[in-house]
Structure formats: C-alpha cells, structure tokens
Amino acid sequence: MNIASVIVDIPTQALDTPYSYAVPDEMLVGEGGRPAAVGCAVLVTLGGRKAVGYIVGLEEVVPSPDEGADLWGTPQSAADLKQVEAVLSAPFFDEEGAACALWLAERYAAPLSECARLFTPPRAVPRIVRGRDGRWRVEEPAIGEVDDRWVTRGPAFDAFVPRKNAVKQQEVLAAVGAGDVRVAELSREFGAVGSTLKALGAKGAVTVERRRRMRGMEDGASRAGAPAGGPAAPAPTAAPQLTEGQQAAVAAIEAARAAGDGRVVLVDGVTGSGKTEVYLQAIERTLAEGRRAIVLVPEISLTPQTVARFRGRFGDAVAVMHSRMSDGERYDQWDFIKSGAAKVVVGARSALFTPAANVGLIVIDEEHEGSYKQDSSPRYRARDVAEWMMARAGGALVLGSATPSIEALYQVNKNPRWTAAALPERANGRPMPAIEVVDMAAEFASGSRAMFSGRLARALGEELAQGRKAVLLLNQRGFAKFLLCRDCGFVPECPHCSTSLTYHEQGAKLVCHHCGYTVAAPPTCPECGSPYLKKFGAGTQRVETELRQLLDGLPGVGPTVPIIRMDADTTQAKGAHQELLESFAAADAAVLLGTQMIAKGLDFDDVTLVGVINADTQLHLPDYRAGERTFQLIEQVAGRAGRAELDGRVMVQTYEADDVAIRAAATYNRGMFLRAELPKRKLLGYPPYVRMANVLLWGADEHAVATEAELLHAQLAELIRNEVGERWQVLPAVPCVLAKLRNTYRYHIVVKAPLGDDLSAPLVRLFRARKVNPAVNAAVDIDPVDLL
C-alpha cells in the first residue's frame, strides 16, 4: 500500500502534524490525470469536510495482517486510512521544499499549512468552497498560463504572391517577413486581420500558432523565457578585472562552497566597493559547476538598476520575483524557474521558496535590512532559512553589507563556520565622501526657523549651479506630519489605531498609514473649537514645496532645476519607480528627494551632494535597535555621493549632534559605535547576547486580550520554570508600543533565552496544547527585529 503524508491546508496550530492518507495505485501513475507526487496539491477529507492538502511524503508500506504504521510511526489499521480523492496540481515543491516547510513550522511556531503555502505561486492553488446546496466542490485556480496567437511564415510563404489590390495581405506578409509577430500587434497596426489571416493560412502563406506569453516582459519585469520573436535580454557582458580585495572575497566564497557544508561569508564592504561584482563572479563559478544561485535584495532596493546588473551578465537565464509584479507575472516567473531555464533568481525574501533545484549559492545583499524578516505568519528570517537551506544542499551563503547587523558581526567573531571578507575601499579608488554634521539646535538658537540649514542651502546652490546632482533624504520612520491644537494640545488620532493621523497637503486630508483610514482635515480643533491647528513635522510633499522655494531663490539654480520626489505616493503606479529614476538620470542638474527607498541601491556618477534632512528622528523610537538603524542609514545614504570621478560630500542635519550613532557614522567609525552600543545590549539582555521571542496577542475586546495575556504569561512562566529553570526570562504581559491597530488591541510577552538554546520547542509545545480563545488571536515571533 502507498501512503501519502499530507499537510492539510487549514491554518491552525491544532493541525500540528501531517496526516496519512492511502494513495490508490492508479494515482501513482497518473491514470486519467496527474500522478501523485511530493509537492502536489490533493483533495482529501478531514473531519467530515473536504480540504486541499499538500503531499510532503510518499512511501510504500507493507502492513502486518492486523496493523500498519503511518510515516510518523503511529500504529494504524490500514483499513482506517482515508484515501486521497484527487490530485489537483503538478508538484509545487520537491522533497527539500517539503522538509523546509516542516522545519519552518517547528522553528517559527507557525501552522504547517502556512509554511507549505510559501512554496506555491500566488492564487495558483485550487480552493474548496461550499455551495448553497451544502456540497463541497473544487474551485479552479484564478491564475494560470496565458497564450498569444503568433503568425509565422507558412510552407508557401516564398511562393505566394498576393493580388495587387489585396493591400492588407501585402502588409501582413511584409510584417511576417521581418519575423514572427503577434496577431495583437498586427491588429493594432492594420486593424482587423482575422479574415486576412484565414485567407493567407488557406494558401499556406502563413501559419497561426499559440505560444505561451511570459507576462511582464514588455515592461522590463523580466524578459527571461521570451518566445521566439519576442524581446530578448542584452548579450551577457564580460566580467571586469577585480581589485585585490574583491579577489580575496571571491576566494573566500569559493572556499566556503568547496567545504560543502553551508558555511557563511560576510562581504563587509563600504558603499561602492564592488560587492555586486563579487556576487556576480561567485555566481559565474557556481553556474559553471551546473548549480544555480538565488540573490535576495531588499524590496526597497530591487530597482531596475539592480536587475540590469544581473541580466547584463547572465542574460535570459535570470528570473525576477518581487511584490510589485502582478500575480500573473509572478506565476510565469515561478514556472520559468521550475522549468530549469532560469539559472539565477533575483528577488525579495520570498524568492527563497521558488522551485529552483540544485542551488549551490545564496546571496543576501544588504543583509542588515529589517525587511528580510516576515511580519506575518510564518514570521521567518530569510538569513536563517537560507543558512539552513545551504547546510542541507552543501552550498554556501553570502551576506553583503556596508553596515552589517550587529548579530552578523557577532557571528563572524564567535562562530567558526562564519568568515568575513573586508572591502574597506571603493573599487575605483575614490575616497568616501566627507560627512558634515549640522547642529540644528544651534541653528534654532541663532534664530533660524528654516527646514534647510544655511550650510545645506549653500551646498545645494554650489553643486547644482555646476550641473551636478543632489540626493535629499527625509527620514520618515517615526517622523510624520500631524496636526496639533496650540490651545488645548489635541492631536487627531485614528479611531482604529493608537497613532496620530498623518497630514497630507494634497487634498488637505488626514490619513492613518497603518489601516488606511482617511478623513478631511478639520478647519478648527474638534475638541475645543480653536482655529489654531498647527502642522508639525514634515512630509515629503511639504519638503518638496519648501525645497522648490529655496532652489528658485538660489543664484545660478532657479526653477529650471527639477525636483524628483520618490515616496510611497509617487511610486504607487506600475513602472513609476523606474520612470522617476530615468528622469533623474536624464537631467543635467536635479534633486532626488525621497524616503528610505533612495538610501541604497542607486548608483549615479554625477551625484555629488547628499543631504539628510532629519537624521535623528529614528533615535526616539522605543526600539533597542534605534541607534544601530540610525548609524546604518547615515552611512548607507552617504554612499550615494561621489561614486565616480567627482568628489562627494554629505550634510547631516540633526538636533542630536552629540549622539554616538551620529558621531560614529559621520566619521565612518564603526568601532566607536560598537564600543558604546554593545555594553548596553549586554547589560539589558538584548541580541546578540540573547535570543528573543515576542508572543503577540490581539483582539477587538481589550479586557479579553489583557486577561488572555495574563493567563498565557502564567502558563509560559510555569512551562519555562519547569523545563529550563531560571536561565530564561519571561517578561510581564504589557500593551505593545502600538497598543491599538486596525480596531484591535495588542499585548505582548517577551521571552529571552541564552544563545544556543532551542527557543522554539517549548513555545511550539505550549501553543499546540493550549486551549484557543476564539476572541483573542495569538502568535509567536521568534527572533523579532523590533518589539513595536
């Protein structure tokens, strides 16, 4: 008998293990449909209802006459096993993907079905729905392949001569003679061509055939897998000569790959040091051995420039995956990867779960970025998943950053499986730009109330007047524009979240950036009726307005210098990100104004000035990483200046000029920052000296959430005390910093454990055994990146 181990697609901790189902022999060979295999979606029955499941194990079992055993060693009568009722899809993943899904569930205390779903393309899995008659039925996937009709030369193309008055036939034949062409393109050019193609087809002059269309190619999302006659990637370029530091970094990666046991190499290189070229050459060596590579880039840095570097080297062998692509585009790229034609996958963190077989190298660029941690279940950290994958596959993991996370630096120091390759200088030999700290408190004391200091204004005038470019960063994290009544102190807040509403100049409206709640800005204070509602803070729209006024008054600059604003509003439309960068590149002198999305991943030779308008706002967040993130942001954005032959300079405006994070970043002195930061982390018990878990609870009834939080805290404290004693800390249940979000109240419990301890196992056991309160949601975040 053949038995399948199936993860049932119902997201609950109660389904904490795969279930065993008998597989009819005809399903194994695919009689009448697809064969059953690991990774397939299947139809099963669980508890009287139909459900979709994923096969994660398949084994032939010979039971004794009275009793058999399932894959997990549980004695079970073979006659009691339910059968797999239908195979609903081809395999989405292989045995390694199945093993990873099971590991993710244990590591991150997540429902098995949510972990398995990571490996499926968006909206490509059949669903089970219940009809009005009460019967369950399978609803086909919403996403699948799409075809285009193409016209090619027929067997009689050369011999056929159309009549002189058959103008449309002549036009169509001329177009086809230049190469295969889509019917849709012929229709756009010549109008309705259906009857013309039918007539030409009857004569054997042309052939009309269906070909799969790879969505997204026409707008540059990825041209990989383009059909004949479609747009092709540029021819691969040759690798440049490496610097000594780059050669040493590539050698370190090669040594890690040769070890074949999942070693980690941290490429610790300043901005402009050529880290990307190191990745490219390490990938070339990996591909030469017949293996594949995955490159992770933060979503915010996944710019057309970044993709072009990889496609310029590897051409049509590059697949791209990111959230700005449509579901159809991602489905096509997923399928392209599964076909084996894609040798390199470039994408955000979810690219880890694409069906790329035989991966020998994973690169995580900007490894310090918080976006590599998923903020919904399963709350995985991409670095840890990639390290697990490479240990299993006998490959190597490469982490790259100009400002590595403190945890990565600690691992290099303490873990013999981790090594570092330093690139302390820029690849072109140019110096790092000088950073000047502008004390805005002193500016204010001298009577200045302007958003731009005198020194930054003068620097803008000097650089722009010479036809050069500037980048201005508005650090909006923890700093947004709001209204405040100067009479009573009232600040309009979101009725659904415990945050102030952000004021938007365009449309004079107040918006909650957590839940999207929007309301017109009141003309007077809703609390006391005062007309003195003052705008505090500065959004990018207001900064753009004041910057325009400043530039218009600068000698030699004036209104002809464009300001290109990049933020969440201006980059919403598809392709807007690329269009804005192209506009900036094409201008003679221009200012790129934006939020953190401009701090990294941009490489323009003629940017000579970088200004940070408000460097210290992140320091005031109740987050133990606040200083680290401020240090990283300043060094990252500073690296946008002076990347080519022209010298660069950086102006950092701050009200906290004496803060060690800002002073250290301004002098590129990581050691200064670490000497101040690490003792605080050790004293207070924060990473890298401990591991943490954040147990989250949320619900619509605040009293119910608080009560459940106290109960769960007591259960946790007892479990930890009994299993590990006093070495772990279970902090009291308290409201989150963001105590209310989208009409739900939020509490959390922080658990701290020594390094090396299995933090997940006790929490997984508790969560799978506890009685669920239907009024309160609960989840575990293992190794959280923040506690907000």
Question: What do these predicted regions represent?
Answer:
Residues M1-S401, A408-L409, N413-R430, L464-A465, ...:
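Accessory, non-ATPase domains that flank or precede helicase/AAA+ motor cores in DNA-metabolism machines
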Residues Q729-V737, D783:
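Solvent-exposed beta-strand/loop surfaces of large extracellular or lumenal domains
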Residues A233-T243, Q247-A251, D261-A706, E718, ...:
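Inter-lobe coupling/hinge segments of SF2-like helicase ATPases
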Residues R670, A706-L731:
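Short amphipathic alpha-helix segments
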Residues R742-T744:
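C-terminal effector/interaction modules appended to NTPase cores
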Residues Y21, V437-V438, M451-L456, L712, ...:
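Short intrinsically disordered coil segments
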